């Protein structure tokens, strides 16, 4: 389908739900999570993609299982196994930090860079504009610090709507990416928040009769404060991202 529509797969991202956790105290749980990640890496290879973005811990888990030293060791060991699998499959790994309200383990850029460096010379990082806005004192310096290891960049505005609908200065952000020589994907990852009150400016945004959606996918979307969106609303959000970013790149 991708080839028929002249679309290239850039990569994918792990959905770290339920018991998926590369820094879990339980060894069997970590092993299961590593296998899931390796399966995702193989999927990217089969789609002829380039990179696999990995969130180390369970999304939504904000309480640690062990000491900082223990969890760092578990993370490095787990990711090293995934890293070696990625090298075998020809897929580059990217560690993604997500904000402190979604994880306790790796939530800002310097942590992701330190983890990538501990894993291997070709292990990269993925940064996300939405999370950068929450966690970084200077997001542009964080991007500059990732020079040479940045292999994916997720785009959504400060309110997690489409680019241009929050207060990110996209011209400045794209300029910073160009400064460090980044020429990879700008992966659209808006998660439009759903307003369930009478103040909702987009009352027709929610899809009331969804098809082809697994319970896991639905759970992931809803736990991010969003919902299943209508095709019209989703397409509009994608178009807004394109309208904002394409003139800048």
Summary of predicted features, one role per range:
Residues 4, 23-124, 216-220, 235-236:
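Active-site acidic/histidine proton-transfer and metal-coordination neighborhood
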């Amino acid at each position: 389908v991708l080839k028929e529509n002249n679309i290239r797969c850039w990569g994918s991202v792990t959905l770290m739900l339920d018991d998926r956790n590369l820094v879990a105290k339980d060894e069997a749980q970590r092993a299961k999570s590593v296998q899931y990640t390796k399966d995702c890496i193989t999927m990217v290879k089969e789609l002829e993609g380039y990179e696999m973005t990995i969130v180390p811990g369970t999304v939504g888990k904000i309480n640690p299982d062990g000491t900082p030293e223990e969890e760092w060791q578990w993370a490095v060991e787990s990711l090293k196994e995934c890293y070696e699998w990625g090298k075998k499959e020809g897929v580059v790994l990217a560690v993604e930090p997500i904000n402190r309200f979604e994880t306790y383990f790796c939530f800002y850029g310097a942590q992701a860079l330190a983890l990538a460096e501990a894993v291997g010379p070709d292990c990269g990082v993925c940064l996300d504009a939405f999370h950068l806005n929450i966690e970084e004192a200077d997001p542009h310096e964080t991007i500059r610090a990732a020079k040479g290891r940045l292999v994916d960049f997720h785009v959504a505005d400060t309110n997690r709507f489409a680019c241009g609908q929050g207060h990110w200065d996209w011209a400045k952000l794209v300029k910073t990416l160009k400064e460090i020589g980044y020429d990879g994907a700008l992966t659209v990852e808006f998660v439009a928040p759903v307003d369930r009150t009478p103040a909702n400016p987009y009352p027709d945004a929610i899809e009331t009769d969804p098809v082809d959606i697994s319970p896991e996918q639905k759970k992931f979307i809803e736990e991010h404060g969003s919902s299943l969106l209508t095709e019209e609303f989703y397409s509009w959000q994608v178009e807004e991202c394109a309208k904002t970013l394409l003139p800048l790149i």
